[in-house]
A protein has these predicted regions:
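Hydrophobic beta-strand segments
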Residues: 41-45, 72, 111
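Structured interaction patches on ligand/partner-binding surfaces of diverse proteins
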Residues: 52, 80-95
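Surface-exposed, low-complexity/disordered segments
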Residues: 90, 98-410
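Structural motif
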Residues: 21-38, 234
Length: 410
């Protein structure tokens, strides 16, 4: 079964935990291009439940923040969404936000032209929301804002949006406003990449629903990449249930050269064209076709546990970094992979027969180094490539950065 890879969901979580109150703030004024203040604009922090509204003079304040890198999102009816990255160090910051009016008529015409649009939207939903059990209770409320483009020659689907995508997650109890910057699904390389800025809102529900949502959130957080990097920052991966190995790619020395294989395939194809099925040349052709399908490289698992103090370095007070050559093979021992995931998802990675069906993710370093914050936020969206369980989990299994797991008694 084809295995899909996920380039680290980017710009999802670029900030620190809003639940751990700090003394800094981001303040500012929202104006139109004429300089007139805009009251009633929604101001959000990407990856959080933190939000406010501009007052009658267009002013706003987002208080209680810690040092870190924040993405401010602004939404106002009749205007295009606005984003601005703000870095807080040792003092609060004031910013001016200028938003532009939205023009939608042309986009509506373009949407109606493409006869394959619904097919592309369905593909996008599967690869953006995901195909986990939680995805069955997720719904995109405004798919009409999506703009699709398919490159037939390169077999790449691209999706963007000029407005917030609204995702209702009835599995976790969140309404997500997602400003989709970019989505690309490459059907040649099997790599999915998407970047965007989400804001989380709590859904209303009964007490029983909220209890169920809390249970599901605990499951979604446990073993996630956010959980891993948070524990990696605090040097507590072992206690949190993670085991880290290294996975190395080596040349498959038993594989014959492509030049020889291609020659043999051409030779026996020619001989078998007018032959009966029992002709020996058919068996030879099958043999060489199998040789063609043999992998050029093999994966070798080094089962010496990686010590986090050798993997992680501190570069700034609130920022740490990792840089490595071979892929990280990360096992989460407190949850198991389901049979459906292992056999049907197309994301499962190989494991030695003596390793239980722990949740396994493989993390490749694409653009070194990878910097990350205390609460699981990876700074550079294109630094890491996920396969395995983290490539399987997508928007349907996201929790906000200010999510705090329950304290479990020993």
């Amino acid at each position: 079964m084809t295995r899909w890879l996920l380039l680290l969901i980017p710009i999802l979580f670029l900030t620190l935990d809003g639940s751990a109150q700090g003394s800094l703030s981001i303040a500012g004024t929202v104006k139109d291009i004429k300089g007139e203040p805009l009251p009633g604009a929604g101001i959000y922090l990407s990856g959080y439940k933190i939000a406010t509204v501009s007052d009658n003079t267009g002013k706003f304040t987002l208080p209680g923040l810690k040092p870190g890198s924040y993405d401010v999102l602004v939404q106002m009816i009749g205007f295009l969404p606005y984003t601005k990255n703000v870095i807080l160090s040792d003092k609060s910051i004031s910013i001016e936000i200028i938003v532009k009016e939205s023009v939608t008529q042309l986009k509506e015409v373009v949407i109606n032209i493409d006869p394959n649009r619904q097919f592309y939207i369905n593909r996008f939903k599967d690869q953006f929301i995901g195909k986990t059990p939680n995805s069955e209770k997720c719904k995109i409320l405004n798919p009409e804002v999506l703009i699709t483009e398919y490159d037939k020659e390169r077999r790449i689907l691209r999706v963007t949006a000029d407005e917030f995508l609204i995702v209702e997650n009835q599995a976790l109890g969140y309404r997500i406003k997602y400003l989709l910057k970019y989505f690309e699904s490459n059907f040649e390389s099997n790599i999915i990449f998407f970047s965007g800025l989400p804001h989380f809102e709590e859904l209303k529900g009964s007490k029983s629903k909220k209890r169920k949502w809390l249970q599901n959130r605990e499951i979604a957080y446990a073993g996630s990449s956010q959980h891993f990097f948070k524990s990696l920052y605090s040097n507590s991966t072992k206690e949190e249930g993670f085991i880290i190995y290294k996975l190395r790619e080596v040349e498959n020395k038993n594989r014959l050269a492509d030049k020889l294989i291609d020659y043999k395939i051409k030779l026996f194809t020619s001989q078998s064209r007018n032959a009966f099925l029992t002709d020996p040349s058919n068996d030879s052709l099958i043999y060489w076709q199998r040789k063609k399908n043999e992998p050029k490289t093999l994966e070798v698992l080094n089962r010496t546990e990686v010590q986090t103090d050798t993997l992680v370095k501190t570069i700034y007070k609130d920022l740490k970094t990792i840089n490595y050559q071979d892929a990280l093979y990360i096992m989460f021992t407190k949850e198991r992979e389901s049979k459906q995931y292992t056999t049907m998802s197309g994301h499962a990675v190989g494991r030695p027969p003596d390793i239980p069906n722990y949740q396994i993710s493989v993390v490749h370093m694409i653009n070194a180094p990878a910097n990350f914050y205390e609460y699981g936020a990876v700074l550079d969206p294109r630094s890491l490539l996920y396969s395995g369980f983290w490539g399987y989990e997508k928007v349907a299994d996201m929790v906000p950065m200010d999510y705090t797991p329950l304290q479990k008694s020993e």
